[in-house]
Design a protein with these regions (language model features):
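Residues forming the flavin
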Residues: 1-53, 57-183, 187-530
Length: 530
């Protein structure tokens, strides 16, 4: 196959034109191209008067490929490599995966395809049950600490924008994207420069992945929470599990620990049992909402109506040495209630696949290091998160309403009494206040400098009517569960800390990739034991 890069089309142009452009680049006739698929697509909006899409396509052509690529500097011969999946004999003691977010799901998929018949323990419910409970909570219903945005099938990423872009360049990424597409996501996620699925589609995709895992001999147990572990001669030997019918012991010699960044009781249990872990830097801040049409105009100008909902990514390093950045930007989305503990409030952002909501939202986060934590213990960052969420719960009225403030009032140091042009989307509701009374000064001082700095980079970002909803505390794990080069815990052989909760990923795709890596290590260990 020949890959041809830097082919350009105007917004709205028929992608069938790519065949003609590819033929022109290779100096052949369009009918000489026997096959074409898009390998990458990105939007170049750097120049307002020349906004266009840039494509890389893969083509098969009649003729000698080596000779043809010499005709075009943007062409190269490529050969896609399939992700290798070994086959093993079914082990006597089945591998166990704790958690069924992206890391646990892709670990289970690989182990199931390899014939290892994994058992998945997920403390939350299946995606359909979870969706109904979250909708009821957002409408004012009761909070469930085991069924929420953090816990349940698909993990926290299911109720987000479903963004799949990642800063890593692991070869496994192509496999992850292809599997999402094969299980119900749109094909364009395999080539978009900024792929996203959307919550509405992702809820279906994760169920399809689960069905394949079960069809291949795996087992998924919902409502099963790990409460302890035991070892034999230093090696993991069993898990204590709280299930719907009571507590039980599950023998296990290979355990992938993919618990997510919000399983605080599990962090405490692991720490109490001596599993090596350490505090790590993470970030906290607020969610900011603008009208999506204002972001579109700022990014695209007059071309906005012909283009999809605009996104942004901003960062700044401030004179006092602090830094801030935007994260998990959700075009046309909503701010979501993301609490996982009773008596706490925290936020997240989500978008559906169409990204057609009135508002844009993003986290505005302040980078925090262990030396910033009031509590210097291993779990000090986690306890700081919890205390801020509890303060927000109280300031919001004790009913899971979130504290909110207009950006103009925040910068002026006065409490807000209601919305302006931007209507908040957080449900069950917001309580207008002064966020300086909710968040630590370490965070508010940095945000007060960052908002105007971002406004200089993106017109209108510091719009006085922009809504700040707090707190955003769960951007990443506050701890790292230490593992070695074999991906095993340095203190408990057979235990594989994995994904975002263990401190080795940040986002859906990188977590899924880490799940594959850990599953590969488990398969290697099982083959050595055979």
């Amino acid at each position: 196959m020949i890959a041809i890069s830097n082919l350009k089309l105007a917004p709205g142009a028929d992608e069938a034109q790519l065949r003609t452009l590819a033929a022109g680049a290779l100096k052949v006739q369009p009918q000489d191209i026997t096959g074409l698929r898009i390998r990458k697509k990105s939007l170049d909006a750097r120049k307002r008067d020349d906004i266009h899409y840039v494509y890389t396509v893969g083509v098969t052509v009649r003729g000698d490929e080596r000779k043809l690529v010499r005709r075009c500097r943007a062409a190269a011969i490529v050969q896609d490599k399939a992700y290798p999946i070994p086959r093993i004999a079914s082990p006597q003691t089945r591998p166990v995966i704790v958690g069924f977010g992206p890391a646990g799901m892709f670990a289970a998929l690989l182990l199931a395809r390899a014939g290892a018949r994994p058992i998945v323990l997920e403390r939350g419910p299946d995606a359909q049950t979870r969706s109904a409970q979250i909708a009821a909570f957002r409408a004012g219903g009761p909070f469930d600490p085991e069924c929420n945005v953090q816990f349940g099938e698909g993990g926290a990423g299911t109720f987000s924008d479903g963004k799949l872009n990642t800063g890593t360049h692991d070869a496994r990424i192509g496999f992850v994207l292809a599997e999402f597409a094969a299980h119900g996501a749109p094909e364009h996620i395999t080539y978009d420069a900024k792929p996203h699925i959307g919550t509405d589609v992702l809820v279906e995709v994760v169920q399809n992945l689960r069905r394949e895992i079960i069809d291949r001999g795996g087992e998924v147990r919902f409502g099963h929470r790990v409460t302890g572990l035991s070892t034999e001669d230093g090696h993991i030997a069993a898990l204590t599990v709280a299930g719907p019918a009571g507590s039980y012991t599950l023998p296990a010699r290979q355990v992938i620990l993919a618990i997510g960044h919000s399983a605080r009781d599990t962090f405490e249990m692991l720490h109490a049992q001596g599993v090596p872990m350490e505090p790590k830097p993470f970030s906290m801040g607020v969610r900011i909402e603008h009208r999506q049409k204002d972001i579109n105009a700022a990014q695209y100008g007059a071309a906005a109506e012909r283009l999809p909902a605009a996104d942004y990514s901003l960062s700044c390093h401030l004179p006092d040495g602090s830094s801030a950045y935007t994260f998990c930007m959700c075009p046309g989305g909503e701010v979501f209630a993301a609490a996982s503990e009773a008596g706490g409030v925290c936020t997240n952002g989500m978008s559906n696949s169409r990204r057609d909501g009135e508002n844009a939202n993003a986290a505005v986060l302040v980078t925090l290091r262990p030396e910033d934590f009031p509590d210097k213990s291993t779990l000090g960052g986690m306890y700081w998160q919890r205390s801020i969420e509890q303060r927000a719960f109280a300031r919001g009225g004790g009913n899971y309403h979130a504290p909110a403030q207009l950006a103009g009032d925040f910068l002026a140091g006065r409490a807000s009494t209601g919305p302006g042009r931007v209507q908040p989307t957080y449900r069950p509701g917001v309580t207008w206040c002064d966020l300086h009374d909710v968040l630590p000064a370490r965070i508010t001082d940095t945000l007060a400098q960052a908002l105007p700095a971002f406004g200089r980079k993106l017109r209108g970002f510091d719009d006085p009517d922009a809504v700040l909803t707090a707190p955003e505390t769960r951007s990443s794990s506050p701890v790292r569960i230490v593992r070695g080069e074999d991906r095993c815990s340095t203190g408990v052989p057979g235990l594989y800390p994995c994904g975002e909760g263990a401190g080795y990923a940040g986002g859906i795709t990188s977590a899924a990739v880490d799940g594959l890596r850990c599953a590969e290590s488990v398969l290697a260990a099982l083959q050595n034991e055979a």
